[in-house]
């Protein structure tokens, strides 16, 4: 049997049980670098399931038996994927297990902030029934929601917001206006255009060098003074020091944050002193239903990968190998390369950038496109996600 390492606290029992049925399983007591290296090498581990643990280049370099890392969820910023690729380790993730739960959390934030829910609850608990006379909340109908990053989560948020009669805009330079219009979404041609118009701004991006700190002082000054910022992506996408100043100085009205730059936050984190911020502990996607689905898919993905079968989803750097294998066969190249042409691939960094076609093509045209792109990937070494 294949040998798999789980890390305390691990995934849901539905996933653990599936792995135990198919693999010899070991448990690491924590996710510290030295602990993982020791456990992997002592037990000749081939596959590992990760959640929030930091998986470093040193781990990949020090553990020659490790072949697969299966991330429980979509985000892989805790894993040095480039190092994994360098050492022949495939990284797997689950991009569609919890997107509905995250979208629901976005709408909860919109409603809670618009109706001053937390303040109203506090007032009633402390005998201030007259809060209803001194506080006038806002409706969300006819308000404008800007979605920054129109991936699975963003598209699901758009559907939910439309049901509340909100005006939905999106900033995503890789999706044309006509495609957005088909979803009932108005395209913001620039981020600034969207920020100027929005009453609520929700960030749905992966953390990359390009997105780190993209919401900062300049962006907050562009936003309406009545606007609310929502972040359910990754904490460092938002410059927290700049956000604190914007909120303290009433440059924007509020924020709702499921993620922070440092988790958990330090006791002296300035944002914690403000009453116009709603916090949740990075569990926007952690509904019971989503956790069950993600745990099961993570286990299935890992088992298939260890058995040499086609896997549910690879992180994009590792798809280079798959594309390269398809270079000699046009249709195989198309099958391997095109899923990430219009799925999550957003930018290519190898000294130059290029926009990738998202439009589905068929037949020989698709095969040619796939083969051409596969050959291009063979010559370039780093492809990364931008949007969720």
Predicted regions located by residue number:
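Phosphate-binding beta-alpha-beta segment of Rossmann-like dinucleotide-binding domains, i.e.
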Residues: 87, 95-144, 159, 163, ...
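Short beta->alpha connector loops at strand-helix junctions that form conserved
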Residues: 28-29, 51, 72-73, 89-100, ...
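Positively charged N-terminal leader segments that act as targeting/secretion signals
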Residues: 328-341, 345-354, 359, 363-367, ...
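N-terminal glycine-/charge-rich "phosphate-binding" loop or analogous flexible N-terminal tail
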Residues: 1-45
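N-terminal Rossmann-fold NAD(P) dinucleotide-binding loop
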Residues: 154-155
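Rossmann-like adenosine-cofactor binding region
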Residues: 57-60, 173-270
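Glycine-rich Rossmann-fold phosphate-binding loop(s) that bind the pyrophosphate
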Residues: 150-151
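C-terminal helix-to-coil terminal segments
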Residues: 1, 85, 92-105, 261-337
């Amino acid at each position: 049997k294949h040998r798999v390492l789980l890390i305390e606290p691990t995934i849901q029992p539905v996933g653990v049980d599936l792995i135990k049925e198919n693999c010899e399983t070991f448990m690491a007591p924590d996710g510290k670098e030295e602990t993982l290296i020791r456990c992997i090498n002592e037990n000749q581990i081939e596959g590992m399931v990760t959640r929030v643990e930091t998986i470093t280049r040193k781990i990949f370099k020090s553990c020659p038996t490790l072949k697969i890392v299966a991330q429980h969820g979509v985000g892989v910023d805790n894993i040095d994927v480039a190092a994994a690729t360098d050492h022949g380790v495939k990284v797997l993730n689950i991009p569609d297990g919890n997107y509905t739960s995250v979208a629901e959390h976005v709408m909860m934030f919109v409603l809670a902030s618009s109706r001053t829910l937390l303040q109203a609850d506090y007032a009633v608990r402390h005998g201030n029934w007259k809060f209803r006379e001194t506080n006038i909340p806002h409706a969300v109908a006819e308000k404008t929601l800007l979605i920054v990053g129109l991936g699975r989560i963003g598209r699901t948020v758009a559907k939910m917001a439309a049901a509340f009669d909100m005006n939905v805009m999106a900033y995503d330079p890789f999706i044309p206006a006509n495609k957005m219009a088909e979803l009932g979404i108005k395209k913001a041609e620039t981020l600034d255009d969207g920020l100027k118009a929005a009453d609520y701004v929700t960030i749905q991006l992966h953390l990359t060098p390009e997105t780190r700190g993209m919401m900062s002082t300049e962006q907050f000054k562009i936003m309406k003074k009545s606007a609310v910022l929502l972040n359910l992506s990754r904490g460092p996408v938002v410059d927290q020091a700049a956000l604190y100043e914007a909120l303290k100085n009433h440059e924007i009205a509020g924020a709702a944050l499921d993620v922070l730059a440092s988790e958990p936050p330090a006791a002296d984190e300035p944002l914690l002193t403000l009453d116009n911020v709603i916090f949740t502990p990075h569990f926007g996607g952690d509904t019971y239903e989503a956790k069950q689905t993600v745990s099961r898919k993570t286990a299935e993905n890992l088992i298939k990968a260890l058995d040499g079968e086609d896997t549910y989803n690879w992180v994009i750097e590792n798809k280079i190998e798959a594309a390269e294998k398809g270079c000699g066969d046009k249709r195989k190249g198309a099958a391997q390369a095109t899923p990430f042409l219009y799925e999550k691939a957003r930018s290519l960094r190898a000294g130059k950038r290029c926009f990738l076609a998202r439009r589905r093509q068929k037949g020989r045209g698709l095969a040619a496109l796939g083969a051409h792109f596969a050959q291009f990937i063979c010559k370039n070494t780093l492809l990364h996600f931008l949007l969720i």
